[in-house]
């Protein structure tokens, strides 16, 4: 048992719980993003340090995003050849963000991110026709790659929460993709930025590999189930999921940043 605990950093029971948490997170993440809301707190609750939890989370997240990407490529929803520039810019952006976060505090992002996530949820809620079908494309080539790949990729490497929603929003608003197609392409760039960020964590020696790989399998399975629903249900499923996940994520981010003030204001502290 001591050997098991030293290898996985958690007990067998907790490892089983983490596997199913990762599966659920992969399912949610493949549809609307936000799976890290489940996995990062779960890893920290299991006793990992914040650094180990973030690094191991990035490893297991690769399982879900890669699983979804493979599914969408095989269904010919996503073409790798058409996304080469976006992939390259996303990789560079995520590596840059992951490198910078080691030297710069992300406090400013923690303050403004809840507002941005709320705006995403409201955007999809108040524009019910958005993403129902393909529309005229507004941006091509390098400009789009810099915004969707470089900027969002940098954000994903630097901070991360809701990156999948930002990718999907870029494909809907700038490329004119329908919501299902945008979600599929978002997973490709999400997988790219996950890999880029993971490489930096590997160099830092913070990844708990055994636990991460077990969760990666759970993520892979959950994301495969979610990806099938994306193509079969389309925007009827994706839109409400994005709105719900955005609301939950905003609430959690606000609580993480201002939990004591909120409790005091409610008279609970």
Swiss-Prot record:
Keywords: Cell inner membrane, Cell membrane, Membrane, Transmembrane, Transmembrane helix, Transport. InterPro entries: TM_pro_TauE-like (IPR002781), TSUP (IPR052017). It is a multi-pass membrane protein. It is found in: Cell inner membrane. Residues 1-7, 52-84, 133-156, 219-269 are periplasmic. GO terms for cellular component: plasma membrane. One of its GO terms (biological process) is response to heat. Its main location: membrane. Residues 29-30, 106-111, 178-197 are cytoplasmic. The chain crosses the membrane at residues 8-28, 31-51, 85-105, 112-132, 157-177, 198-218. Belongs to the 4-toluene sulfonate uptake permease (TSUP) (TC 2.A.102) family. This is Probable membrane transporter protein YfcA. It comes from Escherichia coli (strain K12).
């Amino acid at each position: 048992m001591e050997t098991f605990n030293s290898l996985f950093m958690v007990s067998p029971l907790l490892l089983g719980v983490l596997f199913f948490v990762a599966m659920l997170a992969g399912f949610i993440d493949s549809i609307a993003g936000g799976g890290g809301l489940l996995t990062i707190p779960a890893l920290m609750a299991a006793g990992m340090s914040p650094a180990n939890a973030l690094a191991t989370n990035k490893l297991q997240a690769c399982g879900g995003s890669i699983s979804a990407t493979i599914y969408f490529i095989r269904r010919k929803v996503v073409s790798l050849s058409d996304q080469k520039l976006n992939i390259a810019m996303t990789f560079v952006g995520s590596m840059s963000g992951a490198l910078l976060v080691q030297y710069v505090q992300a406090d400013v992002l923690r303050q403004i991110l809840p507002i941005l996530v709320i705006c995403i949820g409201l955007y999809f809620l108040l524009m019910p026709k958005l993403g129902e079908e393909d529309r005229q494309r507004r941006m091509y080539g390098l400009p789009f790659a810099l915004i969707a790949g470089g900027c969002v990729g940098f954000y994903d490497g630097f901070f991360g929460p809701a990156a999948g929603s930002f990718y999907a929003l870029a494909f809907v608003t700038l490329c004119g993709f329908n919501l299902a197609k945008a979600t599929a392409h978002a997973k490709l760039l999400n997988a790219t930025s996950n890999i880029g960020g993971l490489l930096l964590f590997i160099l830092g020696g913070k990844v708990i590999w055994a636990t991460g790989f077990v969760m990666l399998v759970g993520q892979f399975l959950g994301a495969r189930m979610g990806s099938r629903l994306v193509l079969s249900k389309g925007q009827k499923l994706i839109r409400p999921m994005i709105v719900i996940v955005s609301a939950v994520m905003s609430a959690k981010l606000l609580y993480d940043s201002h939990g004591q003030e909120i409790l005091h204001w409610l008279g609970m502290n």
